[in-house]
């Protein structure tokens, strides 16, 4: 059985990472693809778990060797998604989440046309500013850069299949789970999962 690919995008500070973390903790057969990046690790981040941290030279080499499904430069740092890793997980029947920006999402959609695209929005710019400031991961200069680009990022929601407003964490999480569950009940997924059962059911009907 082949897994489904879920692309989740949001402006920085929207709460995407926290939602995905909780979703993974409560959902079976679901994983998140670990991206490659040239940015410095933040406090508490582990190489190979949160990101594959690398330098610019190695990243550029990987691009030249077509190792990435998508790659982009964001605020002076490079980010990319390994195609080999994603395909291996999908082929193993695992549903895969890509946490990437809208540019990368559109790149991946051209390759995986069945990918399910989800955009998460904050309830307001004021809330977004507060969240970016409260988490204490970036300087005020970086926060202002992120806010300046946020409007353009959020305008891309129109290219996605689903939109979630993260005003209430538990509500947003429930809505995110609902998308995963609904996909797993589609005809295509159920035929893959229960092919033998369905064949036996129809065979019994014919025999009678």
Curated annotation (Swiss-Prot):
Record: residues binding ATP: 10-17
Keywords: ATP-binding, Cytoplasm, Kinase, Nucleotide-binding, Transferase
Family: Belongs to the guanylate kinase family.
Matches recorded under HAMAP family: Guanylate_kinase
E.C. number(s) listed in UniProt: 2.7.4.8
Source domain of life: Bacteria
The name this protein goes by in its record: Guanylate kinase
Keyword Membrane attributed: no
Location(s), subcellular: Cytoplasm
GO CC field: cytosol
Gene that encodes it: gmk
Molecular function GO labels: ATP binding; guanylate kinase activity
Enzyme class (EC, first level): transferase
Catalytic activity as recorded in UniProt: GMP + ATP = GDP + ADP
InterPro entries (UniProt xref): GK/Ca_channel_bsu, Guanylate_kin-like_dom, Guanylate_kinase, Guanylate_kinase_CS, P-loop_NTPase
Role: Essential for recycling GMP and indirectly, cGMP.
Boundaries of every Guanylate kinase-like domain copy: 3-181
